[in-house]
Structure formats: structure tokens, C-alpha cells
Amino acid sequence: MDKLEKALSALLEDAEVAVPLAAVLAYASKTGRISYNEVTEITGDNLEEVLLLGNKWRLLLPTKVEKSGAWEDRLLLCKPGESYELPNIVRYLVQNASKTEHWAPMRAIAEIFKEMDEPDWQKMPELLAELGESARNYQITATQIGQMCSRISLRKKVDVLIAELKAAGVMSPKLGSLAEVSRAGSPLYQLNPSLFTKKPRK
């Protein structure tokens, strides 16, 4: 088992599926994308299981969208002609794990925000920890994010930071249930579960 496989096994708690998924992620991390045919060549009979697990953990997302670019609007189809992409932060996670054997979200978020020229990039691991602590079932509101920014003295405007978190692949708008958004009283976001090794609060 190579370094990336070991890191994924610890995250997914499933060593068997981690092996073909690691091979797919390693290949896709070079360009950020992978085609259905390429996944088939790498995984063989495990194709569907790998794609479902990759999508569930937001490690590998379908490029085809139904309405918006939100994760919940991505159409996962297992057939020729389809393609899949890695959220930006997952590329950092995969490339680091391939060298270190460790799945390191804190390191990845600091690195990606440093690349994005975020002046407070060193505070991003603290923000990620706050997101994980405050989220329920991997969901967080814009109001909560604003409160976190105040607590850790982030200088950026909340709406700008939210746009950057979405671009980085840390989270995506939760648009499917208007009732949920109405109850929250603020825009609702789904966090990328692959960034959190602890199980979420319900």
C-alpha cells in the first residue's frame, strides 16, 4: 500500500476501496480532471463504487451540472463521455498525502490560501477548525462564518471570504431545500467532508 492509499484508508476507514480510489485521485490530481474511460482503465470492476465514494466524500465531482455549479446539482453518471474533477483543495490534499502518507486538511487550506494571496492565510487552519466545530451534519450558515471571522480577526469581508472558500472547494451552497435555508435565516453551505476527520454533529 502506497502513501496516498494509507492516508485515504485512515480517512475512509475502508482500505479495500481506498486502493482504486487513490489511483484515480493520483491520476486526476495532475490536471484536476479525469474521464470516465480513464477511471474505467484504472479501476476495472470497482468503477461505480469508486465514483460513488469519491462523490460522497466530495473528493471527485461530476463536471455535469443540472441547475447551478453547487455540489448537490452535479449529475453523477457512470457512462462513457462523462468526466469528473477534483475540488481545488483536494488536489493539495492528494499531492501532499502522496509524499507524506498523511491526510492534512490544515496544511492544505493554508497552502491554497497562500497561493490565492490571502494576507491572513496563516489563520485559515484556525477557521477550518472553527467550521468543523460549529457545523451540523457538515452544514454551516453565512452568519456563523461571519461570527468566526470576528473571533479570529480575519480582515476580509465575509462575502469575499465565502466566495474564496467556494472557489477553493472547502464548501458549496446548499440550495436544494428552501425550508432548511428559511430555518437557518441565512445562506446555507455544505462543507467538504473530506476536510474533517471527526464525525459531524447531527
Segments from the language model and where they lie:
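Tandem-repeat/low-complexity and Cys-motif detector
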Residues: L11-L12, S150-R151, L161, A179-V181
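Short, amphipathic alpha-helical interaction segments positioned at domain boundaries
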Residues: R74-E115, G185-K202
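Short, Lys/Arg-rich nucleic-acid/phosphate-binding segment
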Residues: K64-R74, K174-A184
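Polar/charged low-complexity regions in secreted precursors and cytosolic/nuclear IDRs
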Residues: R58, V65, P87-N88, G169, ...
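Short amphipathic alpha-helical interaction segments
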Residues: E41-T63, R151-A168
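Amphipathic alpha-helical binding modules
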Residues: E164, R183-S186
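Short amphipathic alpha-helical interface segments
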Residues: M1-D45, K99-S150
